[in-house]
């Protein structure tokens, strides 16, 4: 049984974050407002190479929370968990808590 998947090249393995359907105080949120396409980076590949063979590292690191496109990525199931593989350039941004 597989324990861990390490992506190749400039790919990242992401576990989508499921947004809660209601707030802590019990207010139900509309489906559209809770549909922020974000995920936690689980693993990253080493990066890709440019035309001169120089390594271009991946722009995110394990543990980052990233904003993802609504569609795309390759779905991967490891055990009971569901993940998605994206290319580094497909990530729309990194989310930070202030």
UniProtKB/Swiss-Prot annotation:
Induction: By heat shock treatment.
Domain of life from the UniProt record: Eukaryota
Principal localisation: mitochondrion
Region (Cpn-10 domain): 18-94
MF terms in GO: ATP binding; copper ion binding; protein folding chaperone
Transit peptide endpoints, chain numbering: 1-17
Listed Gene3D superfamilies: GroES chaperonin
UniProtKB keywords: Chaperone, Mitochondrion, Transit peptide
GO cellular component labels: cytosol; extracellular region; mitochondrion
GO biological process entries: response to heat
Subcellular location: Mitochondrion
Protein's UniProt keywords contain Mitochondrion: yes
InterPro entries per record: Chaperonin_GroES, Chaperonin_GroES_sf, Chaprnonin_Cpn10_CS, GroES-like_sf
Free-text function comment from the UniProt entry: Seems to function only as a co-chaperone, along with CPN60, and in certain cases is essential for the discharge of biologically active proteins from CPN60.
Oligomeric and partner information: Forms stable complexes with CPN60 in the presence of ATP.
Family as reported in the entry's similarity comment: Belongs to the GroES chaperonin family.
Entry protein name: 10 kDa chaperonin, mitochondrial
Protein source organism: Arabidopsis thaliana
